[in-house]
Amino acid sequence: SATDLDSAGIGDEDEEELYPEIRQGSLLWLVDSDVGFKLVDQLVEEINTKFYNLDISDGAIEYQYTIYDNPTDHYDWHQDYYEDDDVEFVRKLSISICLSSSEQYYGAEFFIKDGNDLNVRTFKMKYGDFIVFPSSCEHRVNMLREGERISLVIWYGYYK
């Protein structure tokens, strides 16, 4: 149940605004001591070294536990990347980890643009599946039709 979670907004933990036409769902911001993902950190560092070579020198900073459990829950096209004057932490690499089995939900597929609007990849994620991608890539979760989709998103980058 999402009763202890907040409504999913847009922004970071400090400045989050609700736009239900863009995003609906529930979330909980976690701190590093809440999750011990040293193996995930190591995996992300290896993927970054091999494929992206982005500045993630300060490691994992933000953790977001998200539940889509209402038939209209979704997150429209967006980027996780913010590098304006107001942010302390610059997100460079994102990982989305699915915590639901594929039988637990219908809809809520993960879409990501691979460089341009013409090359969109779609993933029906199941428990344990994960996607690592540059935070500047546009992506979305389409509308949940039924069930419950749970994910953990972790952002890696650096402090300004």
Regions found by a protein language model. Name each.
Residues I61, Y75, R91-L93:
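Hydrophobic core residues within well-ordered beta-strands of beta-rich domains
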Residues H74-Y82:
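Histidine-centered catalytic micro-motifs
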